[in-house]
Amino acid sequence: MYLAGSGKTTLLSLLTGDHPQAYANDMSLFGRKRGTGESIWDIKQRIGLVSPEIHLYFNQQMTALMAAGTGFFDVVVPRKLTSEQENSVRQLFSEFNMMDLIDRKLIDMSTGEQRLVLLVRSLVKSPSLLIWDEPFQGLDEKMIGSVTGWLENHMRPDQTLIVVTHHEEEIPHAVNQRYMLPMLSDKVT
């Protein structure tokens, strides 16, 4: 959990390698010190990300299948999927009872349906680290139940899930540790 102004955006961008300070400071992720030869793409390959910001970058003419498939490549532009990748996406849509959305364009979906597609996108490559920033924004109770139920049944012991939220009740039961970021002061010392 976090308070507004607590540094959440900076912390997440450090984890994902999107912040220049991720390489300028002594940091390790996945057992490797940053700046020791891994590319940002090596890091991103092990991370599944959902955020309100990423939602803005998707072409609304993309189908749900295309949008979810971009998770294999850590980009927001669709690429050709292998049959194995497409089958993985279809399997997740089936597990989330979303097969009716798979061929629909994002523009023809509600915000909640789009967010579910992006949640599936974060899972397609079975990453070791899931970072979900406000994942349930726009989802109704049934959708949230579907996601949390999936987590209860499918999270692996070697996976880590970081959920960033303002609301304690949105933290899935699969999360067994919590930390509230304190408010940062206006002064940097």
Report each predicted region and the residues it spans.
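A short, proline-enriched helix->beta-strand linker immediately N-terminal to the Walker B motif
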Residues: 124-128
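ABC ATPase NBD Q-loop/coupling interface
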Residues: 26-42
